[in-house]
Regions:
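Hydrophobic alpha-helical segments of polytopic membrane proteins
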Residues: 78-79, 83, 145-157, 165-217
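Alpha-helical transmembrane segments of multi-pass membrane proteins
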Residues: 21, 88-92, 129, 155, ...
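Structural signal for the C-terminal ends of transmembrane alpha-helices
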Residues: 60-71, 127-136, 176-187, 208-210, ...
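Membrane-helix boundary/helix-loop-helix interface segments in multi-pass membrane proteins
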Residues: 2-8, 12-13, 27-162, 339-354, ...
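Loop-to-helix entry and N-terminal half of a specific, functionally important transmembrane alpha helix
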Residues: 309-349
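Hydrophobic alpha-helical transmembrane segments
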Residues: 52-61, 288-306
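Hydrophobic, glycine- and aromatic-enriched re-entrant/interface helices and adjoining loop segments
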Residues: 192-293
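Interfacial segments of multi-pass membrane proteins
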Residues: 169, 175-188, 267-293, 352-364
Length: 389
């Protein structure tokens, strides 16, 4: 049996680095939540236990999915999952908003489910299934349009019904990348149009951050989404309002310096962040572990993502390319939006730092996505030269 490429080292790196990040994230969640434990002697214990449960389920899911034969799952099951996730996304509206977003389903007082996190991963594996074979031009176009419509429906529900701008952006970027990968005939024209649309979208973002537009926005700063754009343009101008938390984030970065104050010694987590263990966990990490800690985090992410990119470039199978590159984009866009938001480079989006931030849904979804990626890499390891999908 001839192997097209061997990713044994890459697979081990992904597994080892992922588990290290999960453990590190759990420790940092415990540290970040110290500020909320004042006056409640059992709060921190509950947080640690809950995070440990999520981490355990995530790791088990990772290894279980790694052994899945994704290509054998019928397309009809994907449509069932799609509808199920869609209903879950809409059902979130029946529950209370958190920071202006209706993105969670409450399971009593113990935990929540965020369906949008699973929607992101689903659209990756669904795209891999839908575009795995090159059919006739008509079939290819129908599949392309079908995927686009289904992605738009998810995007609209997350953006309008849930009011979750960050998750909508992540989903949109993932689906765009998935649709740009297939080299199948008959869709090149549509892919070119999508590229033009993305260029316009980027120009619109720069336009929204320009001085004339931000001056107009000042009269509507009570809107939380507009307030985030204003805070990104000039956080110090809104230091008592929308820019306060961003400024405190920058102060935490400066306070951490090179080596940090030491684990558990962050000062600003006690009073200056609305979600110190989620959206703003990076300032806590840098304040306690310094710039050295941040670079260590970047290296660990690199050990997870580089093998995915390498496998995507080496594989000759469209489905493998979509899964590996889709997961790569999923992690990368989360990292960019989270770091850029707390670093005052872009508006805050509320997206978590995958494998690090608190939240069972994001941890489980991210570990599942890596499991799907590993399943594809393992499959490519042992596939026959003449074996086709």
């Amino acid at each position: 049996m001839k192997k097209h490429f061997n990713l044994t080292i890459g697979n081990k790196l992904v597994t080892f680095s992922s588990i290290v990040l999960v453990i590190f994230g759990s420790l940092m969640v415990a540290s970040a939540e110290m500020g909320n434990s004042v006056g409640d002697t059992t709060y921190l214990t509950r947080v640690i236990v809950k995070q440990a449960i999520f981490a355990f389920i995530g790791v088990i899911s990772y290894f279980a999915i790694m052994n899945l034969k994704l290509y054998k799952v019928r397309i009809s099951f994907y449509y069932i999952f799609y509808v199920g996730i869609l209903f879950a996304l809409i059902a979130c509206r029946a529950f209370g908003a958190i920071n202006g977003a209706y993105a969670w389903i409450w399971l009593g007082s113990f935990a929540t489910i965020q369906p949008s996190e699973f929607a992101k991963v689903f659209m990756i594996v669904f795209g891999a299934k839908l575009f795995s074979k090159d059919g006739t031009i008509e079939k290819n176009r129908n599949a392309f349009v079908k995927y686009g419509i289904m992605a738009i429906i998810y995007f609209i529900v997350i953006f309008k019904v849930q009011s979750d701008f960050g998750s909508a952006v992540v989903l949109g970027v993932i689906c765009y990348c998935v649709m740009m990968i297939p080299p199948i005939k008959g869709i090149k024209k549509y892919q070119n149009w999508m590229s033009i649309a993305v260029i316009f979208a980027i120009l619109i973002v720069f336009f929204l951050l320009s001085e004339p537009v931000t001056n107009w926005m000042k009269g509507h700063s009570d809107n939380y989404m507009i307030g985030r754009f204003l805070a990104a343009a000039d956080p110090f101008l809104y230091r008592y309002d929308n820019g306060y938390h961003v400024i405190m984030s920058l102060v935490s970065f400066a306070n951490g310096n090179i080596f940090g104050l030491g684990y558990g010694n962050s000062i600003h987590k006690y009073m200056n962040f609305p979600n110190p263990s989620n959206d703003f966990i990076l300032p806590v990490i840098v304040e306690e572990l310094g710039i050295i800690g941040f670079f260590g985090l970047v290296i660990a992410y690199g050990l997870v993502l580089v093998p995915l990119m390498y496998g995507s470039l080496k594989s000759k199978y469209t489905s493998t390319k979509i899964v590996l590159l889709g997961v790569f984009v999923y992690f990368t866009i989360h990292f960019i939006l989270n770091v850029g938001g707390v670093g005052a480079l872009i508006p805050l989006t509320g997206v978590p730092l995958l494998l690090i931030s608190s939240g069972g849904s994001s941890l489980l979804a991210s570990m599942m996505s890596l499991g799907f990626a590993q399943a594809e890499m393992v499959r490519n390891r042992y596939i026959d030269e003449d074996n086709s999908r």
